Amino acid sequence: MAISRLAGAARAAAPVSPGVAVGGSISVVIPARDEADRISPLLEQIVGAPGVAEVIVVDDQSADTTAAIAVAAGASVIAGEPLPAGWAGKAWALQQGIEAASSEWIVTLDADARPDPRLATAVVARADRDDFDFLTVGGRFECPTPATRWLHASMLTTLVYRFGPPGSATTPDRTMANGQCMTLRRDRFLASGGMSIVAGEVVEDIALARRLANDGWSVGFLDAADLLTIRMFESLGDAWTGWGRSLALPGVEPTSRQVFDLAVVLVAQALPLPRLLLGRGDLLDVVLLANRLGTLVGTRTAYDRADAAYWLSPLADLGSVSAIARGITRRGRQTWRGRTYG
């Protein structure tokens, strides 16, 4: 199962590259809650970028200077309304921003995104060329410490083992997405309910992609590492807590499939190396380890640097398995930036 998903990398769709602008203007929507420490690099690159008619920052009731920074950078700022019952914060912020936008095309970006100024026109051109109704793209990760890179690379690999790389063909109920950069046509999206169809989802990007795919939309998830860098986490602890919270895809994957995928990751990704090191491995473990190392070679372009910490990331695989297991078994409410969900 895992090997067949990895083999899909050879058949994956081509990455997004800079494209000629298509007809119709582009609005960039950025949901932001207490992002004063990291939103400036994004705004420096995207305000005034080619093809971008407006940049809308939805200030989701921040307690810091997010709004002032956005105004100073030339963005339009919307003061987010109080969170309605049944909504998660990001989905609500995106809904407000998309409703306020005036362009045919919407590109959403998270505050931790570091885009090439050509990104917006590139993703819109690709969506238009390939007739995607909804397109998300993955970027290149910037991990500021070796420890963060070590764990993050292992966690990313669990997604490749479970779902294949960006651009892989898949079924609607296994569709993947990256909510850090989404592209869609405003009017059709709002006519279909907008973010309200995933209002209460914590993993709203994948839930949205799967809902739209099941409704007959053409949904794409492609690589755009040459045009987008993401700085998600500042430390190993941040990665463990932040990504560990959603790595099991709570609310998106049924428990039975979560457990099955966990078993695939454990057997095919995490166990072969320790089994061989302990002298208990066999030929199958050798084959699986070779696949693991091949995957490591394949994902190196997803990181801003591939140093010793990156190449040693298979040693973190058992930790990544435990993060998925913890996500499957976690019960109760979760807190994020002063809000409690669940």
What would you call each of these model-derived segments?
Residues 65, 111-126:
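Acidic donor-binding/catalytic loop of UDP-sugar-dependent glycosyltransferases
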Residues 23, 30-44, 61:
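Active-site beta-to-alpha loop of glycosyltransferases that engages the nucleotide-sugar donor
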Residues 25-27, 54:
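Cell-envelope/extracellular polymer assembly enzymes that use nucleotide-activated donors
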